[in-house]
Amino acid sequence: MTVSFEKTSDTKGTLSFSIDQETIKTGLDKAFNKVKANISVPGFRKGKISRQMFNKMYGEEALFEEALNAVLPTAYDAAVKEAAIEPVAQPKIDVAKMEKGSDWELTAEVVVKPTITLGDYKDLTVEVDATKEVTDEEVETRLTNAQNNLAELAVKETAAENGDTVVIDFVGSVDGVEFEGGKGSNHSLELGSGQFIPGFEEQLIGTKAGETVEVKVTFPENYQAEDLAGKEALFVTTVNEVKAKELPELDDELAKDIDEEVETLEELKAKFRKELEESKSEAYDDAVETAAIEAAVANAEIKEIPEEMIHEEVHRAMNEFLGGMQQQGISPEMYFQITGTSEDDLHKQYEADADKRVRTNLVIEAIAAAESFTTSDEEVKAEIEDLAGQYNMPVEQVEKLLPVDMLKHDIAMKKAVEVIATTAKVK
């Protein structure tokens, strides 16, 4: 195979390669075996025409296109490997020469990864809006939330206050006409929870059981029901009951109800503090990592990012997200219906920061290459086991789905991120 690659820009070039006679013969054999099944010739049963008779009747050239389709993927991959390039999109392939008895010559217009000039990526100084410190107030807030979760609702005769729960009947209308989904009965609504349209809950503060009030609101402009978006509505609302939370006593008994692994309130506070320390420490490390990566990317120089890489990243991110939804039993159609969005909306959402994600991945890849990371079989095995546990899949299935080269690439990327993050200093 003869191979050459000539760049026409930083991210585009022409790959020229040939297909030798032995490979062509293999392709012709495959092509003949495929097409002969549909050929009927007098004197032969359908599909039983000989190769010699076929060549005499149609000419061997009739098999060229099918033969090329059979051998091109392997030939192109071999040419790419020999030229040591990394295409990032499907090539545009043209046949330069295809004659009987000669090697076939082809050209492919390919898009490749851009040249990356790294700047500083170690010992970077970064600022983060995060802290590992856990305050007494945070522990008390966690405790109060747990106490609230075990609160009981008791009917009250006085007026509803923010935080109370009202049990209501309501009928909504726009311009005097009731609309679908605008009616409810014995609906429990915690005032201040933000469950209803903005402005609705505030108008029920001060009401008492047995009262009927007219609640006037305006639907948000981005409301999922387009026929209601931006419109004024009237809800005739009857308050059936007003209930207030009765908080349990904050003592050792409540502590045991909240967490059966503790015996006292002080033990519960200590456990909450430890959990907060762990979560805040993780969030702090994530913030440092993010800031350090952003700094390393900013220090690098990339001449241009091909549009094809942006498009590929958008589709990859969308497929990953929708695939995750399907694992939870939510089909794409169901997701778009629930959220009131469309595939175009999701595309625009991921397109907004696709350039940043591609740029970041390119720089991290370049750092991994600069550090010449190697990956052991033990590391690959550990990565497979980690993924199997993460996605609740058998190890064997992960091994089939993910090629070793891809796993090694991902491990190298993680090592590059670790170098960037662990050497960073926080201002």
Swiss-Prot record:
<comment type="similarity">
    <text>Belongs to the FKBP-type PPIase family. Tig subfamily.</text>
</comment>
<dbReference type="InterPro" id="IPR005215">
    <property type="entry name" value="Trig_fac"/>
</dbReference>
<dbReference type="InterPro" id="IPR037041">
    <property type="entry name" value="Trigger_fac_C_sf"/>
</dbReference>
<keyword id="KW-0143">Chaperone</keyword>
<dbReference type="InterPro" id="IPR008881">
    <property type="entry name" value="Trigger_fac_ribosome-bd_bac"/>
</dbReference>
<dbReference type="InterPro" id="IPR036611">
    <property type="entry name" value="Trigger_fac_ribosome-bd_sf"/>
</dbReference>
<protein>
    <recommendedName>
        <fullName>Trigger factor</fullName>
        <ecNumber>5.2.1.8</ecNumber>
    </recommendedName>
</protein>
<dbReference type="GO" id="GO:0005737">
    <property type="term" value="C:cytoplasm"/>
</dbReference>
<dbReference type="GO" id="GO:0051301">
    <property type="term" value="P:cell division"/>
</dbReference>
<dbReference type="GO" id="GO:0015031">
    <property type="term" value="P:protein transport"/>
</dbReference>
<dbReference type="InterPro" id="IPR008880">
    <property type="entry name" value="Trigger_fac_C"/>
</dbReference>
<dbReference type="GO" id="GO:0044183">
    <property type="term" value="F:protein folding chaperone"/>
</dbReference>
<keyword id="KW-0963">Cytoplasm</keyword>
<dbReference type="InterPro" id="IPR027304">
    <property type="entry name" value="Trigger_fact/SurA_dom_sf"/>
</dbReference>
<keyword id="KW-0413">Isomerase</keyword>
<dbReference type="InterPro" id="IPR001179">
    <property type="entry name" value="PPIase_FKBP_dom"/>
</dbReference>
<dbReference type="Pfam" id="PF05698">
    <property type="entry name" value="Trigger_C"/>
</dbReference>
<keyword id="KW-0132">Cell division</keyword>
<dbReference type="GO" id="GO:0043022">
    <property type="term" value="F:ribosome binding"/>
</dbReference>
<dbReference type="Pfam" id="PF00254">
    <property type="entry name" value="FKBP_C"/>
</dbReference>
<dbReference type="GO" id="GO:0061077">
    <property type="term" value="P:chaperone-mediated protein folding"/>
</dbReference>
<keyword id="KW-0697">Rotamase</keyword>
<comment type="function">
    <text>Involved in protein export. Acts as a chaperone by maintaining the newly synthesized protein in an open conformation. Functions as a peptidyl-prolyl cis-trans isomerase.</text>
</comment>
<feature type="domain" description="PPIase FKBP-type">
    <location>
        <begin position="163"/>
        <end position="248"/>
    </location>
</feature>
<keyword id="KW-0131">Cell cycle</keyword>
<dbReference type="InterPro" id="IPR046357">
    <property type="entry name" value="PPIase_dom_sf"/>
</dbReference>
<dbReference type="GO" id="GO:0043335">
    <property type="term" value="P:protein unfolding"/>
</dbReference>
<dbReference type="GO" id="GO:0003755">
    <property type="term" value="F:peptidyl-prolyl cis-trans isomerase activity"/>
</dbReference>
<dbReference type="Pfam" id="PF05697">
    <property type="entry name" value="Trigger_N"/>
</dbReference>
<dbReference type="GO" id="GO:0051083">
    <property type="term" value="P:'de novo' cotranslational protein folding"/>
</dbReference>
